[in-house]
Curated annotation (Swiss-Prot):
One term under GO cellular component: plasma membrane
Phylogenetic lineage: Bacteria, Bacillati, Bacillota, Bacilli, Lactobacillales
One MF annotation (Gene Ontology) recorded for this entry: phosphatidylglycerol-prolipoprotein diacylglyceryl transferase activity
Chain sites annotated for binding a 1,2-diacyl-sn-glycero-3-phospho-(1'-sn-glycerol): 134
Record's keyword terms, sorted: Cell membrane, Membrane, Transferase, Transmembrane, Transmembrane helix
InterPro entries for this protein: Lgt (IPR001640)
One Gene Ontology biological process: lipoprotein biosynthetic process
Family in the record: Belongs to the Lgt family.
PROSITE patterns membership: LGT
Protein name: Phosphatidylglycerol--prolipoprotein diacylglyceryl transferase
Protein location: Cell membrane
Presence of keyword Aminoacyl-tRNA synthetase: no
Amino acid sequence: MIDPVAIQLGPISIRWYAICIVTGLVLAVYLAMKEAPRRKIIPDDILDFILVAFPVAIVGARLYYVAFEWDYYGKNLIKIIDFWNGGIAGIAIYGGLIAGAIVLYFFCRRRLIHPVDFLDIAAPSVMIAQSIGRWGNFANHEAYGAAVKSLDYLPSFIRENMYIEGSYRQPTFLYESVWNLIGFILIIVLRRRPKLLRQGEIAAFYLIWYGFGRMIIEGMRTDSLMFAGLRVSQWLSLILIFVGIGIIIYQRKKKAPYYQE
């Protein structure tokens, strides 16, 4: 199996998880800065936003994870900030998205940027970053699904790493990574089509696409908190889908400008 630690520098462990997150972030920032001028947004605003939003999102993702694992962390408070022993592995993407959205609201108000324009730029970048970041779960041997008889359709390096606790496991990380990659490609193609998508609909596409995929894939997992018959992440996914649909209906009704004239 793959060692979750990529580099050991004395007492400091640099995990593949962190490398995947940073790689996804760098690519996301590059793509967003390249697209920003098309929406009359200064590329430096993208960088300034990331410098604030990224650490806040990490904290939000960590707090979200801790909140739903409080039975453990309530008895081991020091583990909440125990990043030097792999604490960064315990984060949840929805917590990061919520924290990032809060930062986005205040950032756009301060810089006098239309939040919808910023979201349209950010959506494909977030999607590709998530696609790459999921491979960190693979290296950590986490976020996997239920036991299956075999995974013969997968390459051996994935199959071997999905043999956990005496059984092969559904590689849900891979399903979500591929799903996000497909969504990213679709957004890049569709946003170049003239008079197809209206302002805000790229962000709406992300919410619907990611929400739908996450809701299905989350049902394959065995390590998620349940609430009222569904996993918490599935409820949040449903919210994303309905918000995305609502944005499209609203933007079409008010005849918002096209993203690409």
